[in-house]
């Protein structure tokens, strides 16, 4: 499984990274995201760590925004997208991880409505970004009543773990 973060600032802009993805040979707009690869780490803490590592940001308010399957026709990957608010730059910037993919991740703040327009024009195509951007726009339209607490149970992930549809042999990070 994996987590992603839609970071929202006080001007209702979302933070998106531009990351090169070799399988499609393109740079894609993406939210900060990562695998649930530290045994025992709560999913929202993984999301907070990824926000710090990839964007150099931290947030005071966290909610579950949306859960989805990335590509259920060929993968069991379940993704939980968190909404991070009260976002500020992390003192010291990004956390250095030594991971090559995180060395140069340019990011920018995009107004929610502009991000939705980019999705609908096909200019944002990463599935996590598409789902996250549309979900945050809908959550805002619903006056944030659709948000769930950060520690909301994730039964789909439990099901996948119990049925052996999730790899549990991922090398732990130290």
Descriptions of predicted regions:
Residues 71-92:
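Active-site-adjacent beta-strand/loop module that shapes the phosphate/pyrophosphate-binding cleft
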Residues 27, 64, 72-75, 99-174:
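Nudix hydrolase/Nudix homology domain
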Residues 56-57, 124:
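Helix N-cap/coil-helix junction residues
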Residues 7, 83-85, 109-111:
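Short, well-ordered beta-strand micro-motif
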Residues 58-65:
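A short coil-to-beta-strand element that immediately follows conserved catalytic motifs
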